[in-house]
Amino acid sequence: MDTKEGSPHVWPTSVEHQSNTAQVHFVPDGGSVAQIVYSDDQDRAQQQVVYTADASSFTSVDASEHTLVYIHPVDGSQTLFTDQPQVAYVQQDATTQQVTVLLPAAQSMNAANLAVLSGVSESAQTMSLDPVSQINRASLTVHDHRLPPMEGADSSTTINSLPSPNAHSDGKEDDDDDDDDDDDEEEEDDDGEDSDLDDWEAEPPRPFDPNDLWCEECNNAHPSVCPKHGALHPIPNRPVLTRARASLPLVLYIDRFLGGVYSKRRIPKRTQFGPLEGPLVKKTELKDSYIHLKVALNSPVDSEGAFQEDLWFELSEESLCNWMMFVRPAQNHLEQNLVAYQYGQHIYFTTIKNIEPKQELKVWYAASYAEFVNEKIHDITQEERKVLREQEKNWPCYECNRRFMSSEQLQQHLNSHDEKLDFISRTKPRGRTRTRRKFGPGRRPGRPPKFLRFDISSENREKIDLGTQDLLQFHNKGPHFEDCGHSTLNGLEQSELTLGTSTQGTPNQQQATQLLPPNEISTPVATTSILTAEDMRRAKRIRNAALQHLFIRKSFRPFKCLQCGKAFREKEKLDQHLRFHGRDGNYPLTCDICNKGFISTSSLENHMKFHLDQKTYSCIFCPESFDRLDLLKDHVVVHIIDGCFSCPTCKKRFTDFIQVKKHVRSFHSEKIYQCTECDKAFCRPDKLRLHMLRHSDRKDFLCSTCGKQFKRKDKLREHMQRMHNPEREAKKADRTGRAKAFKPRLASTDYESFMFKCRVCMMGFRRRGMLVNHLSKRHPEMKIDEVPELTLPIIKPNRDYYCQYCEKVYKSASKRKAHILKNHPGAELPPSIRKLRPAGPGEPDPMLSTHTQLTGTIATPPVCCPHCSKQYSSKTKMVQHIRKKHPEFSLLPISVQAPVLGTAPAVLTADGTSGETVVTTDLLTQAMTELSQTLTTEYRTPQGDFQRIQYIPVSQTTGGMQQPQHIQLQVVQVAQAQSPNQSQHSTVDMGQLHESQGYMQHAIQVQHIQVAEPTSGTQSTPQVGGQALSPSSQEAEEVNPSQLQTPASQAQANSAVQHAYLPSGWNSFRGYPSEIQMMALPQGQYVIAEAAVGTPVTPVSSGQVKAVTQTHYVISEGQGVLDMKKSSSLAEEATPNPDHMEQPASNSSQTTQYIITTTTNMNGSSEVHISKP
């Protein structure tokens, strides 16, 4: 096909489009890589483009800018491109550049077509490429895809070809000139809106320089931040305390601003600290700002005989010393509370006085050690001695302003003041007189008053009233005594010091006195001492002194700082605090904001951090704010209305500002603390911490009454008040004797639709546990054995729990959790299935995150609690229930008893011609049918397991005469038959009874059960009132299988047979009635072969004959007529054992066959037909 040169473009190429040029070169390396090379002025790196296996597209390798090259075959129906070899156009956005190459219908894509693609622009244009010389002409398969529509292309436009690629190499210089023109136009159109990344150019590799920052993406180093990839994301190291600060004892702390070591609590006298740690240097290397401590060496001469210089502790480096380097030296004896001395090779500090909390530790040399280091100890001046003496006397007397060293000394001194107030004469009237007296309030009859009443003169009455009013007015910092009538002042009752306690008495006392006879009225005898106003004032001073002594240490702070509002109890503390504000100007550095003084630059810098984020105290009632809390407290008084504060939002009233502030903060503040686990938010961080306990698994608070655990202490307190309230317990005890009248809430039709039913109340339940709870609450006298539904097995799902970090699989979530904690520490645990929330619309299934898979269901017998009616699927859960609900029985051995029905099985009869019908219960049929369908392989009977077969021959009478007969209950070991005449199948279980099976006979155990059976052939159908056929207490005999083939002299005929097939592992379900056992048979016919061996007839009584037979039944599915040859061949395979032969050889064996057919009626019940073939 010839190429038309000089054909115009399909789309006109504008100037602005010509600037964005690119060249696509094919790299002849196996025909798999193409390369797009941009012009130099575009400042773009080269991109390698790799096409896919079908050669239909190319994908860029570069991650920052993707380039996709699509190669499409042209539809053959479009004659537009028949004369053009190729058409290429570009579509470009911010991150993707798409180059589409169009091929004629008859042309295939090969390496020659990818040689050069030049002039590709944003607008589509045509390009003509002639085949290049045979360079990698390996043909690429191009699928016949339909050509995608191209914007701007008109179907009527004629596409002419461009110059051939052969001429491209010859005219390369012309192309370079065109590229230069395009670059010039691009620079003119540039409006300066390009980002820095567009102007970024790759730098040449730099040599190693420790000051350069390495960028792995650029594979180069930069002087600072990488201009293309930006700054790194640093994670700083965790700060570590120095050795000196980390070794500080817990009872001490270092002041951040002043330095020095202070006590957190009271440290008693004679407490030792140490030893001191630090480097040893010469004296000339010591610094003056620290105490100088010298170490006494064991020998002044070293091993070489040279004289050793004295060594001192250098205490200036925190990384080499311990906390004792921060203890500052004392300037005088008043400040000193530690002594330094050497003991052995170490230096210790010992307290010489009691150190109070927040008191600085200051040390000086001991007397002998000071002489060793050539220092003097601090002498005690008279002023210091006086101050020390006053400090030791912490018990002042406010009557005479004396101070004492102990409370005992103060009490003895107060007794001397009491002697001056000896104006009361005490009496001893106990048992001295027989006159009846009426005493004051608070004294019961028979007890004398503590003090006598006094007559107070009228001139002193007014003075006493004034003194009483002064007594009631105490300091505002002290407590308020409202009930002054019952107070005691230094042995004096207040009621006896007021006017109301005079001889006049109260109105009640006057009335009682008037009712007494005149000879029984006692009049108090006044002494010569009279309570004067001076005595009252003295008593007031004693009372005030005692009360002020009790509360002054905690509440009374008379010395207040005018700058910050902080108050102190002693003036010395205030003076020490004022020095922090720089009042004296002794500090070299002062804060410009608060004028607080500091001794070091680091202390001032730490202080300035508080001003950067200084707190402001805002009023909750108005927009005003304060920088100090005491100013806010003084301000909020203006918002008091009628003695109460009102909430500005809900208008709730409070008597205290603290209460209204807590109310506003809790209910009307912005909730900025968001819970990360749920959507709740809180206004305070402490409330969020309390809420986070809801999402944790820890329950640290245990109720001592019921054993319930809680995550929070307030929830435990609320539980105790609500559940264990004495009133509630009394009401609960009163309710136990009264039972509510039960009214059925369901109709009879709804009742029949439930799986679990209470037949007494005619009530249905959806789950087993609901029925168990109902029976234990409403019918505690009813036994579980009486409810057939509760004896059915429990069907629970079986899951596999996968470890998401390895290939381990576990059967329980707890074992998987233990595995992850042990082998994958720190890994996230999968969520619990019980705590999953249902997925919302559009959300993924939450079960996918649990890494579990349902593998089937497991039917397990229920495990009953021996102390209540609860049932569980495993013994472990039952034991947990006993420990929680029956702790008094938790230490006793637990015996698990599975429920067994005691109902006698129904007896099946046969008349010889027609089968007898047994109709099963609808509920039990449904339950056992579902059970048989959901059995897993774990509960299938293994080969060689023992099975259980029950049968009852029906007694038949002839002429009114009955003869008893011993029928055998045999436990037969069942295995697959190996006979070539029988088909081999797996062992049959309850879910596989519909399959054809063959059985072999093995060693059996024979147990004898006596029932009555007629001897005559008359066919009548009276049932034997028997009991459940279960292994009796008699000793079983071992019978060899060969005995079953021994000929017998008697044959049993016309007897109905009942059989049951249950795995021996289900011991708890033996003893089911026949309708439960028979209903598990699917629809079909089953043959029972009966082999009877006769025994000598033993006379039992008149008219009765006792015969012992050995009968064996083999269950097999078959036709209506049993093949006698197969039965005889089975009998010939066994060899008789003479040791076990109990019958003569002349007895002939006879086999009787029974056919069991199960059908289903229209009403859903099952019927069992037993007949002879």
Curated annotation (Swiss-Prot):
Residues 248-366 form the SET domain. InterPro entries: PRDM10_PR/SET, SET_dom, SET_dom_sf, Zinc_finger, Znf_C2H2_sf, Znf_C2H2_type. Its main location: nucleus. Residues 172-202 have a biased composition (Acidic residues). Residues 267-371 are annotated as: N-terminal PR domain. Disulfide bonds: none annotated. The lineage of its organism: Eukaryota, Metazoa, Chordata, Craniata, Vertebrata. Coiled coil: none annotated. This is PR domain zinc finger protein 10. A zinc finger (C2H2-type) spans 395-417, 559-581, 589-611, 617-639, 645-668, 673-695, 701-724, 756-779, 801-824, 863-886. Transcriptional activator, essential for early embryonic development and survival of embryonic stem cells (ESCs). Supports cell growth and survival during early development by transcriptionally activating the expression of the translation initiation factor EIF3B, to sustain global translation. Activates the transcription of FLNC. It is found in: Nucleus. One of its GO terms (biological process) is methylation. The keyword RNA-binding does not apply. Residues 430-447 have a biased composition (Basic residues). Residues 1150-1160 have a biased composition (Low complexity). Residues 154-167, 1161-1173 have a biased composition (Polar residues). It comes from Xenopus tropicalis. The gene is prdm10. Belongs to the class V-like SAM-binding methyltransferase superfamily. GO terms for cellular component: chromatin; nucleus. Keywords: Activator, DNA-binding, Metal-binding, Nucleus, Repeat, Transcription, Transcription regulation, Zinc, Zinc-finger.
